[in-house]
Amino acid sequence: MRHRCRVHKLGKPADQRKALLRSLSTQLIRHGRVTTTKARAKAVRSQVEKMITLAKDGSLASRRQALGYIYDKQLVHALFDQVADRYGDRNGGYTRIIRTIRRRGDNAEMAIIELT
């Protein structure tokens, strides 16, 4: 039974939603900060936290799993190299969501998601 197993649907079919989250995750890891809608920021937060936890593990299986999710191979290697000294003592809470002003065109709630 799937009771209480919620997924952020984001108004998209499953394949488009997966591609959107992969793209946002890749850009967040690359740039450290991304401006997006509040719902997308909340959805991408769990994916990025999983990738950072995989990188903290550092095993070959974790690296291959991250390579299957993040679009850029060099970005995965850089993430695995620098994550131990950046997040080594922290158990979760690697991202921060900051609410900003609403988008002008459709008044959507916007947010900045950044790596701490």
Swiss-Prot record:
Gene3D superfamilies: Ribosomal protein L17. It comes from the Bacteria. One of its GO terms (molecular function) is structural constituent of ribosome. One of its GO terms (biological process) is translation. Keywords: Ribonucleoprotein, Ribosomal protein. GO terms for cellular component: cytosolic large ribosomal subunit. Pfam families: Ribosomal_L17. The keyword Ribosomal protein applies. Belongs to the bacterial ribosomal protein bL17 family. PANTHER family: LARGE RIBOSOMAL SUBUNIT PROTEIN BL17M, RIBOSOMAL PROTEIN L17. Part of the 50S ribosomal subunit. Contacts protein L32. HAMAP family: Ribosomal_bL17 (MF_01368). This is Large ribosomal subunit protein bL17.
